[in-house]
Amino acid sequence: DSSVSNDIKITFFPTKHWSARGLFDRNQSLWGGWALDTERLNILHLGDTAYDKMFLDYQDKLGSIDMTFMPIGSYFPRDIEAEYHVDPYEAIQLAKDLESAYTYGIHWGGIFFTQEPTYEPQEIIKKAMIEDPTLNFETSIPGILIEIP
C-alpha cells in the first residue's frame, strides 16, 4: 500500500518476521518495512526481517534505491533467529539484491536479546567492505546521528 503526503510517497511492504502486540494475537498482523520516495532520494527502511526471495521483486517495484536502513543484529543462534532476522552476511546479500546505492546497518548493539558478540555485526560489515570495495555499507555506534548523503 502507498500514500502520498507532502510530496513524499510512502509505501508499506511485507518483510519476513513474526508479529504480536498482546497475548492472543501472534501473527495476526503484517510485519513490514517502509519505502520513502522523495524528489531527492528513495529510502528503504526494512525494520526486522529475515532473508527472503520476495525481496528480489522489490527492486523492480520500488525502483532505484538510494539508501537502505538494513538490520544486521539479533541473529544468533541461527537455528532460532534465521526465520526472523538476517545475519550480517545475509544483510550484505540483501543490499546487493536490492541494488541499494548506500546501506546503513541498524538493529544491533542496543538491546541484547540474542547471543552474538556485541560488535560482531559491525566487524563483519567492515571486513566485507575491505574485501569488496564496491560495497557501500556503513555502521556506527547505536544512537548516533547520521547525515543522509
What are these regions (language model features)?
Residues 1-63, 142-149:
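Core dinuclear metal-dependent hydrolase active-site scaffold
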